[in-house]
Amino acid sequence: MSHPAHPRRFSALPQAFFCRPAEVVGPELIGCFLVKRQNDGSLLWGVIVETEAYSQDDPACHGYRRRSPQNETLFGEPGRFYVYVSYGIHHCVNVVTDRSDWANGVLLRAVAMPGEPERVAAGPGLLARRFGLNRTHDSQAVCGENEFWLASRPSVLNVPELVTTTRIGISQAQDLPWRWYLQDSRSVSRRARGDRMPALSQAFIPTLEWKR
């Protein structure tokens, strides 16, 4: 299902937004839009509700102690997709942050989609599948309104209430509090222990009628 909207409602984030450490950019991406321009000109979009940060000095980072053709994008210019395949099955979509020659990035873990099942993009693999993102999109810029871009938050999410917790599915640096999610969202891949899913009547649900 696509969600037509006027492109002016989805102003691309500037590259300067991404020229900061991942642990700064990660929480600030919560509430921003992931947008895809489809072949018919319509826009498929959702609200980012969960992210994780990774840095070169972090043992869980792909760029920790190694630089290779497979992770070269992670060492490159900020504001580009870094897409890799996890366990040979799922694509995971990251955004490169900080500076060139320093592996740093934010993993997009979950997106809330208007008018669709609440968990259709609740996890990195599901997110990539819903938007059709794969290795061919590795190194593609996210700062311009091309096929894909990231856009600023809507006014209703100027100050989102976030949960800060540890990352998921890693064997090292498990204690770093570098995962964030929108507390009122039901589209988060996994909630922190003790944090109950909000009732449907109280949950954040993106709507096609938003006015920005």
Swiss-Prot record:
Domain of life: Bacteria
GO molecular function annotation: alkylbase DNA N-glycosylase activity; DNA binding
Keyword Chloroplast part of the UniProt annotation: no
One of the Pfam families matching this protein, by short name: Pur_DNA_glyco
Keyword DNA damage carried by entry: yes
InterPro entries membership: Formyl_transferase-like_C_sf, MPG, MPG_sf
Top EC class for this record: hydrolase
GO biological process: base-excision repair
EC numbers: 3.2.2.-
Keyword set, alphabetical order: DNA damage, DNA repair, Hydrolase
Family, similarity comment: Belongs to the DNA glycosylase MPG family.
Family matches, as HAMAP family: 3MGH
Protein name, per record: Putative 3-methyladenine DNA glycosylase
Organism: Synechococcus sp. (strain CC9311)
